[in-house]
């Protein structure tokens, strides 16, 4: 198994600031513990369950959306961090912007379970190897 790279909490905080500056909304971390827990969820799943990038990326998407760790921009940070995680690990999602937006709205509205999100990520995931074929 290749080494799997994870975004740091510091990177996520910087990304959140950039997102809010670019797209609007309120700055601020509402719950540092919720952020830490959401970020650690993917690392814990790697350690205890799986190295599947779709599952780990979906874990970021689901837990960051549900954690509401920030005052504003929770869906946006969840989308960016889950895609950043995949990019760090030479993968990406082959989904349209509309599909991504719908997915994160559904996660935030609790219309999808973590397993539902994992299935979507598995359906859309392209690894570097697949991308070069």
Region spans (language model):
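FIC/Doc superfamily catalytic core
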Residues: 1-133
């Amino acid at each position: 198994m290749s080494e799997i790279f994870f975004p740091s909490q510091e990177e996520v905080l910087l990304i959140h600031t950039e997102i809010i500056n670019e797209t609007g909304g309120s700055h601020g971390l509402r719950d540092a513990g919720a952020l830490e827990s959401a970020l650690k969820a993917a690392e814990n799943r790697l350690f205890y369950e799986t190295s599947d990038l779709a599952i780990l990326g979906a874990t970021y998407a689901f837990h960051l959306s549900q954690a509401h760790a920030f005052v504003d921009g929770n869906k946006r940070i969840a989308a960016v961090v889950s895609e950043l995680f995949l990019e760090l690990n030479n993968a990406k999602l082959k989904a349209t912007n509309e599909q991504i937006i719908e997915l994160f709205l559904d996660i935030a509205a609790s219309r999808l379970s973590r397993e539902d999100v994992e299935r979507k990520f598995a359906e859309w995931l392209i690894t570097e190897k697949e991308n070069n074929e």
